[in-house]
A protein has these predicted regions:
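Transmembrane signal-anchor hairpin modules in multi-pass inner-membrane enzymes, especially those
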Residues: 1-54, 87-91, 95, 151-160, ...
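Transmembrane alpha-helical segments and their membrane-water interfaces
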Residues: 17-30, 44-45, 49-106, 146, ...
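Hydrophobic transmembrane alpha-helices and their immediate junctions
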Residues: 158, 195-196, 284-329, 362
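TM-adjacent membrane-interface loops and short helices in multi-pass inner/ER membrane proteins
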Residues: 236-278, 282-289
Length: 377
């Protein structure tokens, strides 16, 4: 596990390169425009970061970051976005995001059974193979909508459905162990948005998970019991630990509204809030496209919600994307989730947007077909 953490970025780059090669071999389908508009504005934000780092920071790092982010966008364009041509591939896209959570949770569960304090915990909070507990929380919460889709979409009770439910319970428990209030908000937001029109299904899921936790938690060893209480206390704290950072970011933006605060290191550093971090670091140059990206994501959420009302057959698919985007956007106000270039929040945002665009494209195609049929009569 320690070796995985130490070599995580190189392994990710290798996998990214393999996906690029695989994507290049994929033929075009019926969809022509594959990249959702919000991603273009996210690219504009990265361009602002690149320019500032290039002019005032480390030139080598600027080009490396730009190349990495460009490769991620190209991978999404050639791979997942192009593969989305039918319902089967949509479900594969959701499955792939869920499997990120499965691999992460089960790998760290295995490590915890061997030695709970090696790698998986730092300062009493779960971090897994990530850099800190906030990163772990963002990864775990970002996969919750996909688990709910896989559970609700499988009508019959079998081992596969039990596996997804068990995985969601494990994801939820590790999310609790991060002690991250941001992660808790993201997870709760995703659940509420997913079941926004089906309160009965939400109650059944909560009761089922509650029963499973009541059975499983007493079976955990004493080390887990000693960890639970200090972590639980973090969720009842009312202290705003980010107020000083937010105030500093706001003042940095007010003092340098066009291009942000002067760069004092080799690269830009971000934290605590996507919007304030972008404003403080890049000024209006990066803040404006970031806001447009956020508004574009909200516009997609509204369009998908309306789609689920008009065509209930797409309720599960639409709810997965709506809850996924809501989850990430809610977390963006307390963590700089969208300003990285090779992070799970950025990649999952692109995947959710690509999945959402596919659903809207399908709806547009169906509407055009129905219009054509009416003109033929």
């Amino acid at each position: 596990m320690q070796q995985l953490r130490d070599t995580g970025r190189p392994i990710t780059i290798v996998l990214l390169a393999l996906l690029l090669l695989l994507g290049m071999q994929t033929r075009n389908g019926w969809r022509r425009i594959l990249i959702p508009q919000p991603i273009y504005y996210l690219m504009a934000v990265q361009a602002a970061i690149f320019l500032k780092t290039l002019l005032y920071g480390n030139m080598e790092f600027a080009f490396l970051a730009a190349l990495t982010f460009g490769s991620v966008v190209l991978m999404v364009r050639l791979g997942p976005a192009r593969w989305l041509q039918d319902e089967y591939n949509f479900q594969l896209g959701v499955w792939s995001l869920a499997m990120v959570g499965v691999i992460f949770a089960f790998a760290n569960a295995y490590q915890s059974l061997v030695d709970i304090h090696a790698v998986t915990f730092a300062q009493g909070r779960f971090i897994g193979t990530t850099a800190n507990s906030q990163h772990a929380a963002a990864l775990l919460a970002g996969t919750v909508p996909c688990f709910m889709f896989l559970i609700e979409n499988r009508k019959k009770w079998d081992l596969i459905k039990v596996f997804w439910i068990g995985s969601l319970v494990l994801i939820g428990y590790f999310l609790f162990l991060t002690g991250s209030r941001t992660g808790a908000i993201m997870g709760i937001t995703s659940i509420l948005f997913f079941y926004r029109q089906r309160a009965g299904s939400l109650v059944r899921l909560v009761l089922l998970i509650g029963i499973l936790l009541a059975i499983l938690l007493p079976l955990l060893n004493q080390d887990f019991a000693n960890i639970n209480l200090p972590v639980a206390n973090r969720f009842i704290l009312t202290e705003n630990t980010r107020q000083q950072v937010w105030s500093g970011q706001w003042n940095g933006f007010i003092n340098n509204p066009l291009f942000g605060s002067p760069l004092e290191a080799d690269r830009l550093g971000f934290g605590e809030n996507v919007w304030l971090a972008a404003a403080a670091s890049t000024g209006l140059l990066g803040f404006i496209p970031l806001v447009i990206m956020g508004l574009g994501s909200l516009k997609m959420m509204l369009a998908l919600h309306q789609l689920s009302l008009k065509k209930p057959i797409y309720f599960m698919q639409s709810s997965t994307i709506v809850s996924g985007l809501a989850c990430l956007l809610s977390g963006s106000f307390t963590e700089a989730l969208f300003l990285g270039n090779l992070t799970f929040p950025v990649m999952s945002l692109m995947i959710y947007l690509s999945l959402g665009k596919y659903l809207l494209d399908v709806n547009d195609m169906q509407n055009k077909y129905m219009l054509w049929l009416t003109t033929q009569k």
